[in-house]
UniProtKB/Swiss-Prot annotation:
Main localisation: cytoplasm
Function field: Catalyzes the hydrolysis of ferric enterobactin (Fe-Ent). Is responsible for the release of iron from ferric enterobactin.
Protein name: Iron(III) enterobactin esterase
Phenotype of gene-disrupted mutants: Disruption of the gene abrogates enterochelin-supported growth on iron-chelated media.
Superkingdom of origin: Bacteria
Keyword check for Transcription regulation: no
GO BP annotations, alphabetical order: iron ion transport
Known EC number: 3.1.1.108
Length: 353
């Protein structure tokens, strides 16, 4: 998923969620009207640097065309584990149409989330098999839920979507680092793109044996063109078309928070190519360095200093940029799903690539 932010919190604080859930009027129209006024998720401070989030989902009144839901799964970026064989689900509040889920997070949390209500036949039911077979079955099941995902209609921030097109809502807590350039977009507005500074090329890669779109954008500045920093954005089609980032980059540059730079947004072609090229694929990075970047430099010069070059990605894209960084390293370590995580801590070094 994606993280954006306002200069202020986009969720509202409620002093006592347990009292709210115990209210005899819970689930009534007046109760939901109050929720809509507050906005969700509800936020309760529980310590100096932690808060409790309460997510709420309103089940539609069952009708002839309305399914009966058995579970409402929730995916909160950086909080829930979508690899788990026991994924997080909301609880139904008594016999009402209220479903809820709570989590404790840092008070500077920012992230996206979605609800996935399912009928009985869509609930997770893993077959017998090897650990690898069960992991693959779990992954296939999770991907199948993407078409069922919903954003949160009670969230006051404008909804957005993932690179797969999954509907998402955002949480921006009060202590999160300000990202004010996104404020118009979070309010449902669009920022203009200066098309005179946007170039779309087709990268025909002999090494990879494929072709794809690449967007090149440069922001205004007084720096010598040959010294401009370079930023490479993986999943470039998302940032170029689904959630255009060009206006945000202009705003950040004009405000002096970013230097005038050259941005290269690389299309994934499709999901199968993304799954092959981004994680642990040295050929992809070799092709990028020897084929694509010289083409980009001929159109928009940039520095060759590694210290002024950035690669940004998420999920497979994050793995890809990590591989880019450590291609020449003797070893790289990452977390294995089967390894136990120490109580109260995070796993740092588990298995070797």
């Amino acid at each position: 998923m994606k993280s954006r932010g306002l200069s202020v919190s986009t969720t509202n604080e409620h002093p006592d969620s347990q009292r709210l859930l115990a209210d005899p009027l819970a689930g009534s129209e007046s109760w939901w009207q109050q929720i809509a006024q507050w906005g969700t998720p509800l936020v309760e401070p529980i310590s100096e640097d932690k808060v409790r989030l309460t997510f709420l989902w309103r089940e539609p009144v069952a009708g002839a065309d309305e399914p009966t839901y058995s579970r409402v799964y929730i995916d909160v970026n950086g909080v829930t584990d979508h690899h788990s064989t026991h994924p997080e689900t909301l609880q139904r509040l008594g016999q009402t149409h209220v479903w809820y889920w709570q989590a404790e997070v840092e008070s500077d949390f920012r992230g996206s989330y979605s609800f996935m209500p399912v009928t009985a036949e869509h609930c997770l039911n893993l077959p017998e098999g090897t650990p690898q077979e069960r992991r693959q079955a779990q992954r296939n099941w999770w991907i199948s839920l993407m078409d069922l995902a919903q954003n949160d209609p009670f969230n006051h921030t404008a909804p957005h979507s993932s690179y797969r097109g999954r509907p998402l809502s955002a949480v921006h807590l009060a202590d999160a680092i300000p990202q004010t350039a996104w404020q118009p977009i979070d309010a449902g507005q669009q920022l203009p793109t200066d098309t005179q500074r946007l170039q779309l090329i087709t990268w025909h890669s002999e090494l990879l044996g494929n072709s794809r779109n690449v967007w090149i954008y440069h922001t205004h500045g007084t720096e010598d063109n040959a010294e401009r920093p370079l930023a490479i954005l993986l999943d470039g089609q998302y940032w170029a078309t689904r959630q255009p980032i060009f206006g945000v980059l202009d705003n950040e540059t004009d405000a002096g928070r970013l230097p005038a730079s050259v941005y290269v947004l690389i299309d994934i072609i499709d999901q199968p190519h993304r799954s092959v090229e981004l994680p642990c694929n040295q050929d992809f990075w070799q092709a990028l360095q020897t084929e694509l970047l010289p083409q980009v430099a001929a159109l928009q010069p940039f520095t060759d200093q590694a210290s002024r070059t950035v690669v940004a990605g998420q999920s497979f894209g994050w793995v890809g940029l990590a591989i880019c960084r450590i291609t020449l390293a003797a070893a790289f370590w990452w977390c294995a799903e089967s390894s136990p995580v120490p109580s109260g801590g995070r796993m740092l070094i588990i298995s070797k690539l």
